[in-house]
A protein has these predicted regions:
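Reductase modules of NAD(P)H-dependent flavoproteins
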Residues: 1-22, 57-170
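Generic hydrophobic alpha-helical scaffold/packing signal
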Residues: 17, 30, 42-49, 80, ...
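Beta1/beta-strand and adjacent pyrophosphate-binding region of the FAD-binding site
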Residues: 27-34
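Classical protein tyrosine phosphatase
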Residues: 34-64
Length: 170
């Protein structure tokens, strides 16, 4: 019989598991991250490209990640290269854009761009076709609000953007 004297209290705080988002029913998926907000996006990319094959309408995925400098871009560079490599044998086109927001110049490297991402350009490009686009943003509130405003503006122009976001604050 267990003793009640040796109790251990455990507190778990989430989220845990996978995001319950039905992005597989969209032709175009745009994933936008700021800083450590890349974490759930890596999970989504792995599910799309390395997970169990399931029925999907996805034709293209654009992943945009903004970090201050080259150091932070290395956090998940191995995963990015791996996902990009396996996407080449997929019918789904993967485009990866990593923005070094404080960099004036960018060292030579796969996926790297200097300055803040031009979300207007990226979201407008993803919604060129009449097919609905799924937009997921995870990052600081300012980034999420900016992407939301652009998506709303595009919706007013008749483009369809289904928007989901996660924010973090410290």
């Amino acid at each position: 019989m267990a003793s009640t004297e040796n109790r251990v209290w455990v507190r778990a705080d989430g989220p845990y598991g996978h995001l319950n988002l039905d992005y597989h029913r969209y032709s175009h998926v745009v994933l936008i991250a700021g800083g450590i907000g890349i974490t759930p996006i890596i999970g989504i990319l792995k599910e799309i490209f390395a997970g169990k094959k399931r029925r999907s309408r996805i034709q293209s995925v654009l992943m945009v990640w903004s970090v201050p400098s080259e150091g932070e871009s290395g956090w998940f560079m191995d995963e990015m290269k791996y996902l990009y490599q396996i996407s080449n044998s997929s019918s789904i086109k993967l485009e990866i854009k990593i923005h070094l927001s404080r960099a004036k110049e960018v060292p030579p490297g796969l996926f790297l761009n200097s300055g803040r991402p031009d979300l207007d350009k990226y979201l407008d490009g993803a919604t060129q076709e009449r097919a609905p686009c799924f937009v997921f943003v995870c990052g600081p509130k300012k980034l999420v609000n900016s992407a939301w405003d652009i998506s709303t503006k595009l919706q007013r122009k008749g483009k369809i953007c289904h928007f989901h976001h996660e924010t973090f604050q410290f």
